[in-house]
Amino acid sequence: MTVPTYDKFIEPVLRYLATKPEGAAARDVHEAAADALGLDDSQRAKVITSGQLVYKNRAGWAHDRLKRAGLSQSLSRGKWCLTPAGFDWVASHPQPMTEQETNHLAFAFVNVKLKSRPDAVDLDPKADSPDHEELAKSSPDDRLDQALKELRDAVADEVLENLLQVSPSRFEVIVLDVLHRLGYGGHRDDLQRVGGTGDGGIDGVISLDKLGLEKVYVQAKRWQNTVGRPELQAFYGALAGQKAKRGVFITTSGFTSQARDFAQSVEGMVLVDGERLVHLMIENEVGVSSRLLKVPKLDMDYFE
């Protein structure tokens, strides 16, 4: 027997989490949903091309939809919990979900962007969600493009969520890894983390040449609020103290308009917000891996 589609996992995941006010480990939610759906051993053994178990993958996508609907959240790595809105929804819907309710949760919030913590930045504030009937009428190529977009969006949300949970020192290392993948520094050792007490607002230094004559200074912050002009002025002062010509300020949050105006008014300062950082990590496969899917296409020249 085949494993039920991910939309069928939405209600079991939702109902199980409603019994766990302190949250539950994702692996426990996977098993509870599989039990609720009556999956046998053969169904639980099925895997997707990446090697992940199908039922765990579909339970994960069900939880993704609940998060986008504002009904659930990830408290930490591998721990899920309903939001107050989620508990309210379950309390007001004691009867089994109708097909219409399931479809609404499965498809209406596909492109809603997650904001995993108050200090996170919205990755893409506005986008239209495709109707499930519209998707059903789409060509396979269109559905493939939409699926790829959903996967990228989901990974982007997960990357940002994990960035917000790592230690400040680990975040600084990650930022330097990203900059190295972008081509800064001939060798990874050319990018040095210097953050710590008395760092003067400098978290990393990149040597652009072997003698270290040309350097880029980096500030990497998991900011709890939008970064304003005062923070950039302090960073600019730290750059001046190093007689530096170039500086990069990277944050998981965003920048105020005043901060951006200040950065444009001085030479050599580049700003990277959470959205840009996440997409740089995805594009350069820092903390992210990818798999190749071969899509067949007829070679007309061969038959001529």
Curated annotation (Swiss-Prot):
Pfam families in the cross-refs: Mrr_cat, Mrr_N
Transmembrane segments: none
Record bears the keyword Transport: no
Region described as Disordered: spans on this chain: 120-142
GO terms assigned for molecular function: DNA binding; restriction endodeoxyribonuclease activity; type IV site-specific deoxyribonuclease activity
Organism, as annotated: Escherichia coli (strain K12)
Keywords: Restriction system
Record-given protein name: Type IV methyl-directed restriction enzyme EcoKMrr
